[in-house]
A protein has these predicted regions:
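Active-site neighborhoods and metal-handling regions in enzymes and metal-associated proteins
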Residues: 1-357
Length: 357
């Protein structure tokens, strides 16, 4: 944890900051090991560049041995006044994007004239590059996702509803000891798969339809995410061709990932494959997103992101083609940027398969 705090402090110094309030519960855990869901109550870590960090905790939080100095409050005390007594009102204060206005505005009233700036990047950029312990947890979450995906492929049958299949996915995660899903499972049959974020409904799987399953679990606080697309029976020539196209786009992007490569160029590698086949207009989202303690963390793989890949980054590669009124295909893996290239965390087969027969 000390190494993580020092990395954040270095980022703060690079931005000219001497102090910061970290309030995102996942970032607080990342830096201190304290895991709390505060709900409407105040949870904050005061992090100075020099000096001991200070945790501000409600007495209802189950934190028996705080790893640093702790200032406690109950429900009738004013925790913002406690923070005001610790911060340097003459210096700029960085805050993260999760801190509610109901705490920030009173602090500014306690400390009139204090400059406040958004400093989420100081923590988020550190969280983007996973250390070895985090990489191990991400591999395990992806291994479970592969196993559950393989089970789903065997489970799906013509006549089932999208909700039935989604419920099976969720039950499998619990059976594998996961805390739950990293996001709401997406199951899309036929034309529903042309909506990238379709919510499972009572649509019944019919012969000849595509089956798109986008799924992820949360295990030991870390998330997985993958998508596979199959067909209920032998696909048509068009369905098979689109699936093969998306598969090639996925592989083209993954082959490019290594330290120093711009993330916009990774996006372009997949997009070019699809565009050259005449389907560019039907790939209507970015190629990928960063992932870790949450399914979508800061950072993406898109045409707008000129940042370069760095060792330890983990993000999705998920090209898709979505044909309104017909079907959709998406193939998604998570990749870990290594020192020399990338490691694809998902091993489950990406080729099209016949299911439900």
């Amino acid at each position: 944890m000390n190494q993580r705090i020092e990395r954040v402090r270095a980022a703060m110094q690079a931005q000219g900051l001497t102090q910061m309030i970290v309030s995102d519960p996942k970032s607080v855990w990342y830096l201190t090991g304290v895991e709390v869901e505060p709900y409407e109550r105040l949870l904050a870590l005061y992090l100075p560049v020099c000096g001991e960090p200070v945790l501000f905790l409600n007495r209802l939080f189950n934190v028996p041995n705080p790893p640093c100095k702790a200032v406690w409050h109950d429900d009738v005390q004013d925790p913002v006044a406690q923070i005001a007594g610790v911060v340097d009102a003459a210096a700029t204060l960085g805050i993260d994007k999760e801190w509610p206005a109901r705490f920030l505005i009173p602090l500014m009233q306690h400390c009139p004239g204090m400059r406040v700036v958004l400093a989420s990047d100081c923590v988020d950029d550190c969280r983007a590059c996973k250390d070895e312990a985090e990489q191990t947890l991400m591999r395990e979450a992806s291994r479970i996702n592969d196993e559950v995906n393989a089970a789903v492929k065997q489970y799906v049958r013509v006549g089932m509803t999208e909700k039935q299949v989604a419920r099976f996915v969720d039950e499998q995660y619990l059976a594998h000891g996961c805390e739950g899903n990293s996001f709401t499972t997406i199951v899309s049959f036929g034309a529903n798969a042309a909506d990238p974020h379709h919510e499972p409904d009572n649509t019944v799987l019919q012969p000849g339809q595509c089956v798109l399953v986008d799924m992820g679990c949360r295990k030991n606080r870390y998330c997985s995410d993958m998508t596979r697309t199959w067909f209920a029976g032998t696909p048509t020539e068009k369905q098979a061709a689109v699936h093969e196209l998306v598969h090639r786009a996925n592989l083209a992007a993954e082959a490019l990932v290594k330290p120093g490569v711009r993330l916009c160029d990774v996006d372009a590698a997949a997009r070019q494959v699809i565009a050259q086949a005449g389907y560019g207009a039907y790939f209507n989202h970015r190629l990928g997103h960063f992932i870790g303690q949450t399914d979508h963390e800061k950072g993406d793989v898109s045409s707008a992101n000129t940042a370069v890949a760095k060792p330890g980054m983990i993000f999705s590669i998920e090209p898709g083609v979505y044909l309104p009124g017909e079907f959709g295909v998406r193939i998604e893996d998570l990749v870990l940027v290594t020192e020399t290239g990338c490691e694809v965390l998902n091993r489950e087969d990406k080729n099209w398969a016949c299911v439900g027969e």
